């Protein structure tokens, strides 16, 4: 899994930071799969500075309906049609997302020439398919807001082909079924259990991408044990009370969550426009006082989950 940050500012853009949006490239072995998390104003323009194209998106997840996470969506959807893209697209987000998209398209006389599905989510499982389990967690914000936990399925262990051949199983298409741990029947009537020929499985990676939130119990549940946590860090620690009153988190509150949840890496993002580069580095230092393995997200930063 690989993250590309298209926008890392909160509320309004700055000269160096666009509105919130993140590409998740799943790098599937058999086909391309690309997801987008939030779509603030200017997101489609940010795409132009990356190797990616909106027409290749399969899914878009919206955390909440505040404009800095959403107002780039209608334009991106329309441009996708104008550029002749036909790949189906599914949108996920809180109640009201369907009305927002349909109203924006209707009032502007716009449409999509590709299949567009809009699914309004609630707390709990969003889907479990094609190697990934996505769960939505309710957060603490003035409007309905979710974070998304993306858990990669465990990868099957290596198939012991040499032992299969030694046991009289001929190489060929059956090996693909056995690799998946399935049972197959041979021409001589023997039934072979693939799971007996597999080495230890490799645990899948887990990614927690938060929407806007003040500290809350659900945040801990969502982040627990994640390999990577992407979390807003809107204000510095001295302004924690102000941040919380508006449904946001401070630098050290975010770091404390990462520490308590036992995450591998914290990527801090969604910085107030009041902070220049020096101010953001100051917040990074505050985070690292509590959770040393913290990274500061910047527009177009790429992070690959090893």
From Swiss-Prot:
Entry annotation: catalytic residues: 68 (proton acceptor)
Assigned keywords, A-Z: Endonuclease, Exonuclease, Hydrolase, Metal-binding, Nuclease, tRNA processing, Zinc
A GO MF term: 3'-tRNA processing endoribonuclease activity
Cofactor binding annotation: Binds 2 Zn(2+) ions.
Domain of life: Bacteria
CC cofactor: Zn(2+)
Enzyme Commission number(s) of this protein: 3.1.-.-
Metal-binding among keywords: yes
Annotated InterPro entries: Metallo-B-lactamas, RibonucZ/Hydroxyglut_hydro, RNase_Z/BN
Binding site for Zn(2+) 1: 64, 66, 141, 212
Keyword Transport: no
Binding-site list for Zn(2+) 2: 68-69, 212, 270
Similarity-based family: Belongs to the RNase Z family. RNase BN subfamily.
Binding partners and assembly: Homodimer.
Function noted in UniProt: Zinc phosphodiesterase, which has both exoribonuclease and endoribonuclease activities.
PANTHER family cross-referenced by the UniProt entry: ZINC PHOSPHODIESTERASE ELAC PROTEIN 1
Protein name per its UniProtKB record: Ribonuclease BN
Lineage of producing organism: Bacteria, Pseudomonadati, Pseudomonadota, Gammaproteobacteria, Enterobacterales
């Amino acid at each position: 899994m690989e993250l590309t940050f298209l926008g890392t500012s909160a509320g309004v853009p700055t000269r160096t930071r666009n509105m919130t949006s993140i590409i998740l490239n799943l790098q599937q072995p058999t086909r391309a799969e690309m997801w987008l998390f939030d779509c603030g104003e200017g997101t489609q323009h940010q795409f132009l500075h990356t190797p990616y194209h909106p027409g290749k998106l399969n899914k878009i997840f919206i955390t909440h309906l505040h404009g800095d996470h959403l107002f780039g969506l209608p334009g991106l959807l329309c441009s996708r049609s104008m550029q002749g893209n036909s790949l189906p697209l599914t949108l996920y987000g809180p109640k009201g997302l369907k009305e927002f998209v349909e109203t924006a398209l209707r009032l502007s006389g716009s449409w999509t020439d590709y299949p567009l599905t809009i699914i309004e989510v609630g707390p709990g499982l969003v889907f479990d398919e094609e190697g990934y389990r996505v769960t939505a967690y309710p957060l603490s914000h003035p409007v309905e807001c979710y974070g998304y936990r993306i858990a990669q399925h465990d990868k099957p262990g290596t198939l012991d082909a040499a032992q299969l051949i030694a046991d009289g199983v001929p190489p060929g298409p059956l090996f693909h079924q056995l690799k998946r741990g399935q049972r197959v029947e041979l021409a001589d009537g023997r039934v072979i259990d693939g799971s007996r020929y597999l080495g230890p499985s490799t645990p899948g990676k887990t990614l927690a991408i938060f929407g806007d939130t003040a500290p809350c119990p659900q945040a801990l549940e969502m982040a627990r044990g994640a390999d990577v946590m992407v979390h807003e860090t809107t204000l510095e620690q001295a302004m924690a009370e102000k941040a919380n009153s508006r449904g946001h988190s401070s630098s050290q509150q975010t770091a404390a969550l990462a520490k308590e949840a036992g995450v591998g890496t914290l990527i801090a993002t969604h910085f107030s426009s009041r902070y220049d580069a020096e101010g953001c580095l100051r917040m990074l230092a505050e985070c690292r006082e509590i959770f040393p393995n913290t990274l500061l997200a910047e527009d177009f930063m790429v992070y690959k989950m090893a």
